[in-house]
From Swiss-Prot:
Family assignment from sequence similarity: Belongs to the ATPase A chain family.
Gene for this chain: atpB
Single GO term (MF): proton-transporting ATP synthase activity, rotational mechanism
Alphabetized UniProt keyword annotations: ATP synthesis, Cell inner membrane, Cell membrane, CF(0), Hydrogen ion transport, Ion transport, Membrane, Transmembrane, Transmembrane helix, Transport
Membrane topology according to the record: Multi-pass membrane protein
Transmembrane segment boundaries: 29-49, 87-107, 116-136, 146-166, 183-205, 219-239
Keyword Hydrolase: no
Protein's cellular compartments: Cell inner membrane
Organism for this UniProt entry: Bartonella quintana (strain Toulouse)
Protein name: ATP synthase subunit a
């Protein structure tokens, strides 16, 4: 029996579900669109159900939502102070959206929207545009002090300022690439190991014995991917709070 090895990249392909075009614009409803909506709906339903509980003893869902709430609130307060709480809806929405999207992508035949650079870059740009918009609205031209560190000798000030500007505008790139690359690499690794298991089993009795180690590795990597799914949402949230601090307190 001959079989073709599964393509580990095929799972990231964007496919049209409903063809929609307006003039020369392709506005088709794709699998990415579907899972974006599914992520928003799943997150909203979970938060609605968990916040509807009125019992004296919190349910498991209520405890999870309270932990998420306290994590975002405490991270914002530590990074930006009390003023940072005005960004709570944004940061909490980003955290829950990324976390749920990452978890949904771990289920077989489900799509991982955070493995698409266009999704992660859009989320990162939302953060940076919020920082720039709020910074100029709150501080005016004083927001530019962010790029002029205090205590720097005048001789090297232009060089340091240029480095600060480059560093600032590279933030959406690093923020989006970190999430995208981790989710992409993890799912490719899982696909490779699972494909190897299927190929070994197709060889018969001898292949079944040889598939035990890859199976153990697949289970271990799957468990690790659940941890990575949380850690990536955690890191994105912490960095978002740090960047928002620059908008609240632009002076070094």
């Amino acid at each position: 029996m001959t079989s073709h090895a599964p393509d580990p990249v095929h799972q990231f392909e964007i496919s049209r579900l409903i063809n929609i075009s307006v003039g020369n614009m392709d506005l088709s409803f794709t699998n990415v669109s579907f899972f974006i909506i599914a992520t928003v709906v799943a997150t909203s339903v979970f938060l609605f159900i968990s916040s509807s509980s009125r019992g004296l003893v919190p349910t498991r869902m209520q405890s999870i939502s309270e932990i998420a709430y306290e994590f975002v609130a405490s991270t914002l307060r530590e990074s930006c102070g009390v003023q940072g709480m005005q960004f709570f809806p944004l940061v909490f929405s980003l955290f829950t959206f990324i976390l749920v999207a990452n978890f949904i992508g771990l289920f077989p035949y489900f799509y991982t929207i955070t493995s698409q650079i266009m999704i992660t870059f859009s989320l990162a740009m939302l953060v940076i545009l919020t920082v720039v918009g709020y910074g100029f609205r709150k501080h005016g031209i004083g927001f530019l002090k962010l790029f002029v560190p205090s205590g720097v000798p005048v001789v090297i000030l232009p060089l340091v300022t240029m480095i600060e500007v480059i560093s600032f505008f590279s933030r959406p790139i690093s923020l989006s690439l970190r999430l995208f690359a981790n989710m992409l690499a993890g799912h490719i690794t899982l696909k490779v190991f699972s494909g190897f298991i299927v190929s070994m089993i197709e060889l018969g009795i001898m292949g079944v014995g040889g598939s035990i180690l890859p199976l153990i590795m697949t289970v271990a990597i799957t468990a690790l991917e659940f941890l990575v799914a949380f850690l990536q949402a955690y890191v994105f949230t912490v960095l978002t709070c740090m960047y928002l601090n620059d908008a609240v307190h632009p002076g070094h």
